[in-house]
Regions:
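A conserved amphipathic terminal alpha-helix motif
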Residues: 440-442, 446-476
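Oxidoreductase cofactor-interface core, primarily capturing Rossmann-like NAD(P)-dependent enzymes
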Residues: 16, 23, 114-225, 242, ...
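Hydrophobic ligand-binding cavity/cleft-lining segments
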Residues: 7, 192, 282-289, 293-377, ...
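Hydrophobic-ligand binding "helix-grip"
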Residues: 381-429, 437-441, 468
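Conserved glycine-rich Rossmann-like NAD(P)H-binding loop of the short-chain dehydrogenase/reductase
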Residues: 25-32
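Mid/C-terminal beta-alpha module of Rossmann-like enzyme folds, strongest
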Residues: 2, 194-254, 265-331
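NAD(P)H-binding glycine-rich loop region in Rossmannoid oxidoreductase-like domains
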Residues: 35-99, 109-115
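N-terminal Rossmann NAD(P)H-binding glycine-rich loop of SDR-like oxidoreductase domains
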Residues: 3-25
Length: 476
């Protein structure tokens, strides 16, 4: 089958593609920014650069698409996200109108008919909009998705691993029905072309109905940790959002959205989909165990932290590829090196649990200050310890370019600051070049740069020396 994928660079999309390729399908992947396209060069995978928020009649989809997956969500988008999601759905229908599309598979959230959060109500409205297309709609509604790198999993992990005693809001007693990411992908991949599922919606769920408190307790049990959890009715949604924001790696916008959704009970409607598709979901305990098995093997295929909703990043990567030369303040350093590959390995391992090789306390302090002002801080870390792709999050940086062939890494700062900042590493002819570039925004931007200049001297000097000297010692 020829299958169209939307949400290609998202958490689900990046994981679904290998499942569909293994099943022998040909894929046409829609991406907003071609620079962020995953699986480039893979057989049976092609890409179309398209922004579903804007309809462009000049963009044409292949007319021989058999099935499509609608995986676009704006969980923490600012502004009127409901309107944005409906615009995406309406534009999608316009794009596929000339296409001989037989089936659309939409991944939504479990609906509580008595009470809906804004985001789940938006998902429902999108489903109703998509029902009006020239295809058969299959909707899968999932609750909490448990997998390495998923927002819910990483937030629970942060809470359990960082806090021996938790003073928590009362919504921790809300019931939900989690499902493993592997089972979600199995349902999605097996749905393609199955006419029994045409024009139907199904809840997909694991066998356990749990409160969020029970999920935390089971998670702690898997990790071999003893945790005390105390729930208080006095924590307001705003206070709960700040609690999640400061303790976990989530952004405040996403924390607010999650808190609103977590107050609503989402328990699945029983159905026979499991028997129909021969997918038998594992329980929550095993889903957590499976997630850590992937983490321990450095096999995380995608993470919510790499999505643009984890920060305030706006626009395409190409907008930031050209580092400005005029009207900027710079810190440029270079060092002679003997072993280019070894130094490159160290550059490619920067951030996350590795840290920045020098002055990590100062880096952490800058990250803490960034969090206080509503920024991302250092808590996102990185998805993989040694692999980097354009578009990945790396602490409070966004990877703009990661080209091992040309031996260049370019990072763009997502910190809160009065200006824009780039950090570039480049190796050429046995020399390492390190460029820190800041484009100030007005007088405050210039004052900011000069106020941190003494720290920059130690940090950037120490960083380039550590990248080179540690390698040279090992070579010697």
């Amino acid at each position: 089958m020829k299958i169209l994928i939307t949400g290609t660079t998202g958490y689900i999309g990046k994981r679904l593609i290998p499942f569909l390729l293994k099943a022998g399908h040909e894929l046409v992947c829609c991406v907003r920014d071609i620079e962020r396209a995953p699986f480039k060069g893979k057989e049976r995978v092609s890409f179309i650069e398209i922004d579903f928020l804007k309809y462009d009649p000049a963009i044409k989809l292949p007319t021989d698409i058999d099935c499509a997956y609608y995986l676009m969500h704006s969980m923490s988008a600012s502004g009127d996200f409901g309107k944005m999601e409906l615009e995406c759905a309406e534009n999608f229908k316009k794009y596929v109108a000339p296409v001989n599309l037989k089936q659309l598979v939409y991944l939504s959230g479990i609906i509580n008919e008595k009470e809906l959060s804004k985001h789940l109500n938006s998902r429902k409205e999108v489903e109703e909009s998509l029902e009006g297309g020239n295809y058969a709609l299959t909707t899968f509604r999932a609750g909490i998705i448990v997998g390495s790198g998923s927002a819910s999993f990483e937030i629970i992990r942060d809470l359990v691993e960082k806090l021996p005693v938790m003073i928590t809001p009362k919504w921790l007693n809300t019931k939900t029905q989690p499902i493993s990411i592997r089972d979600v992908l199995s349902y999605l991949s097996k749905a393609a072309g199955d006419e029994r599922l045409y024009n139907n919606n199904y809840d997909i769920y694991g066998p356990d109905v749990l409160t969020y408190k029970q999920m935390l307790e089971i998670f702690a049990e898997v990790r071999g940790l003893k945790r005390k959890i105390i729930t208080l009715p006095i924590m307001t949604p705003k206070l709960s959002s700040y609690w999640l924001y400061f303790v976990t790696s989530t952004s405040y916008r996403l924390a607010s959205s999650l808190v609103e959704s977590m107050k609503v009970e989402v328990v699945a409607r029983p159905n026979h989909l499991s028997e129909m598709l021969q997918v038998f979901p594992v329980n929550y305990h095993d889903a957590v165990v499976n997630a850590f098995a992937v983490i321990n093997q450095d096999g995380i295929a995608s993470s919510w932290k790499d999505s643009m909703v984890s920060s305030h990043f706006a626009g395409k990567l190409s907008k930031y590829v050209k580092v400005p030369k005029y009207g900027v303040l710079q810190d440029n350093k270079e060092r002679d090196i003997k072993n280019e590959e070894k130094v490159l390995d160290r550059i490619w391992a920067l951030g996350g649990s590795t840290g920045w090789y020098y002055g990590n306390t100062l880096w952490k302090a800058r990250g803490f200050i960034d969090r206080l002002f509503g920024g991302t801080g250092l808590r996102r870390g990185r998805t993989h310890p040694s692999k980097i792709e354009a578009g990945d999050a790396l602490d409070f940086w966004r990877v703009i370019s990661a080209d091992r062939k040309s031996k260049r890494l370019l990072l763009y700062a997502e910190m809160r600051m009065p200006g824009e900042a780039w950090l570039e590493f480049k190796i050429k002819n046995n020399k390492l070049y390190q460029h820190a570039v800041f484009r100030p925004r007005g007088l405050w931007g210039r004052l900011y740069w000069y106020s941190v200049l003494p720290f920059h001297y130690f940090i950037f000097n120490g960083l380039i020396n550590s990248l080179v000297e540690d390698v040279e010692k090992k070579v010697a």
